[in-house]
């Protein structure tokens, strides 16, 4: 969905924070992001590391609210370890797009996995390690 169509105001706050760390048209780097500056959202935030060849995504941090909702903590695990393979494939595709386009992306997801009948929004924000290491 277009970023401006997000319904969750918390996501707008996180997006504003990310944009504030963007200097001179470059993506904010991982070192620019300080989780202590958005403590109010930490339980809802996942931080992922991007691995190359093959392209994989590994949870550096799985937010506690998300882990509780899903029934397991993915911290330290790759997305392909998610038991529900359609969800793993969806996540991989969405995150791969963020990496390829070097731009934020928003999604509204309706799911019957975990909590039946749940709809939620996801905001994915790229933060490479260095300006030269982004694929």
Spans of features found by a protein language model:
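Intrinsically disordered, low-complexity terminal regulatory regions
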Residues: 1-82, 89-135
